[in-house]
């Protein structure tokens, strides 16, 4: 699972989603990409499951770039705990995704293989996604 080695603060505020992605919304590394169409907190487990799905589908040919990183900790209180007594301990890590953000890029494979790999991988994600290519960007 992806997680930061160290952070400035252990327990960040929850925040909220406003607007669309102004950064990370262009294809930089590969030829084809998977783009988010909805706002979401992507967990490190979801990112890893999607990565494994794509690499297995393309049979480890080409190159895959992960364009998101889970750098926000989500805290959780233990079950059957009374309210109060401070904020819970960090439980898992998420990446904050806005609409239009590029999640994954792939290169060195055909367009049909990349499309099918990303279509298969999108079932691992809790949001609607779109397949885009560099030539039509």
Swiss-Prot record:
GO terms for cellular component: chloroplast; mitochondrial large ribosomal subunit. The gene is rpl16. NCBIfam families: rplP_bact. Part of the 50S ribosomal subunit. It comes from Rhodomonas salina. This is Large ribosomal subunit protein uL16c. GO terms for biological process: mitochondrial translation. InterPro entries: Ribosomal_uL16, Ribosomal_uL16_bact-type, Ribosomal_uL16_CS, Ribosomal_uL16_dom, Ribosomal_uL16_sf. Belongs to the universal ribosomal protein uL16 family. GO terms for molecular function: rRNA binding; structural constituent of ribosome. HAMAP family: Ribosomal_uL16 (MF_01342). Gene3D superfamilies: Ribosomal protein L10e/L16. Its main location: plastid. It is found in: Plastid, Chloroplast. Keywords: Chloroplast, Plastid, Ribonucleoprotein, Ribosomal protein.
């Amino acid at each position: 699972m992806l997680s930061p080695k160290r952070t400035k603060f252990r327990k960040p505020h929850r925040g909220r989603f406003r607007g669309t992605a102004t950064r990370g919304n262009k294809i930089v590394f590969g030829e084809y990409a998977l783009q988010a169409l909805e706002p979401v907190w992507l967990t490190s487990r979801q990112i890893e499951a999607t990565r494994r799905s794509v690499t297995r589908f393309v049979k480890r040919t080409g190159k895959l770039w992960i364009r998101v990183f889970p750098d926000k900790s989500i805290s959780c209180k233990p079950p059957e705990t009374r309210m109060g007594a401070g904020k819970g301990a960090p439980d898992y890590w998420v990446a904050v995704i806005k609409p239009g953000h590029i999640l994954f890029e792939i290169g060195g494979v055909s367009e049909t293989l990349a499309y099918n790999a990303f279509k298969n991988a999108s079932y691992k994600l809790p949001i609607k996604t779109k397949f885009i290519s560099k030539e039509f960007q």
